[in-house]
């Protein structure tokens, strides 16, 4: 009796069998492979497979399987996506990605819809991802005083007795939203922020969110300046939210900026508490 083929030999045999398929059938087969596996396992097989993964056909088939209202609307827009969209280039046209994926591949890999595009929204990683300016005794990270619903971590950033600010710049194209989709007029950008105060000290909180073009010029702005929280007011969390819609063409970045301080000028960290900041992108159905 002959020796049983090894697992590696069996894998090679299956791979050879697939490579013999006509391109139109191979595209159908590969469209059932998860996006990350397509890139890491299928793309290196051969030049033909690489070209298929780098092109739009497989990714369009994956998007077509979502039959929800949002999925159908997205698929209609995806069919008009340029096949050679320069999905990860800066304003000077320089690329910053190791693979020459089409824009649809990047979208499926990074899945920007529905997820929070703000990184480290609750301070669970310290100040990573944020540009920080410290006033007074500076920013600190502490445990939440009250439960914040839906937060990935029950921690928050805390301000001091002088103005503290921090900012995060979200590159929507780098996160997976191709430029033509942003320019389609059917995209909404939803922002939200949670803030509050200590019971024994009042605070002041400000939020500014700006939509910027590829050169980081401001196009649209939203600002929130709630009334200061007074000392000995009931301790609670408050939410600020806004939806950008019909913002025109050319948007690439979201600049998310927070400001806070206390009202008593106490040494330490008695100012506004901020957490669970979010930027989300979705299809506008109406």
UniProtKB/Swiss-Prot annotation:
Keywords: Ubl conjugation pathway. Substrate-recognition component of the SCF (SKP1-CUL1-F-box protein)-type E3 ubiquitin ligase complex. Able to recognize and bind denatured glycoproteins, which are modified with complex-type oligosaccharides. Also recognizes sulfated glycans. Does not bind high-mannose glycoproteins. One of its GO terms (cellular component) is SCF ubiquitin ligase complex. Gene3D superfamilies: 1.20.1280.50, Galactose-binding domain-like (2.60.120.260). Residues 107-283 form the FBA domain. PROSITE patterns: FBA (PS51114), FBOX (PS50181). Residues 15-62 form the F-box domain. InterPro entries: F-box-assoc_dom (IPR007397), F-box-like_dom_sf (IPR036047), F-box_dom (IPR001810), F-box_only (IPR039752), Galactose-bd-like_sf (IPR008979). Expressed primarily in the brain. Transmembrane segments: none annotated. It comes from Mus musculus. Part of a SCF (SKP1-cullin-F-box) protein ligase complex. Interacts with SKP1 and CUL1. SMART domains: FBA, FBOX. This is F-box only protein 17.
């Amino acid at each position: 009796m002959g020796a049983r083929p090894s697992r590696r030999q069996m894998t090679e045999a299956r791979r050879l069998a697939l490579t013999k398929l006509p391109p139109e059938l191979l595209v159908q087969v590969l469209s059932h492979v998860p996006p990350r596996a397509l890139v890491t396992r299928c793309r290196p097989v051969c030049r033909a497979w690489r070209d298929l993964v780098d092109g739009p056909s497989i990714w369009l088939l994956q998007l077509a399987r979502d039959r929800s209202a949002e999925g159908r609307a997205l698929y209609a827009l995806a069919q008009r996506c340029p096949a050679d969209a320069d999905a990860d280039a800066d304003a000077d046209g320089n690329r910053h990605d190791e693979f020459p994926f089409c824009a649809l591949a990047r979208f499926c890999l990074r899945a920007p819809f529905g997820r929070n595009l703000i990184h480290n929204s609750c301070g669970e990683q310290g100040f990573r991802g944020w540009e920080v300016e410290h006033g007074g005794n500076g920013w600190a990270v502490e445990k939440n005083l009250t439960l914040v619903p839906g937060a990935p971590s029950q921690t928050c950033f805390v301000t001091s007795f002088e103005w503290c600010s921090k900012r995060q710049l979200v590159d929507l194209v780098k996160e997976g939203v191709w430029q033509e989709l942003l320019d389609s007029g059917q995209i909404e950008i939803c922002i939200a922020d949670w803030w509050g105060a200590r019971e024994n000290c009042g605070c002041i909180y400000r939020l500014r969110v700006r939509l910027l073009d590829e050169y980081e010029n401001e196009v649209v702005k939203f600002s929130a300046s709630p009334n200061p929280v007074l000392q000995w007011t009931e301790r609670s969390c408050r939410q600020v939210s806004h939806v950008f819609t019909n913002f025109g063409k050319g948007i690439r970045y979201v600049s998310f900026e927070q400001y806070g301080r206390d009202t008593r000028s106490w040494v330490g960290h008695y100012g506004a508490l901020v957490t669970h900041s979010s930027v989300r992108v979705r299809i506008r159905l109406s």
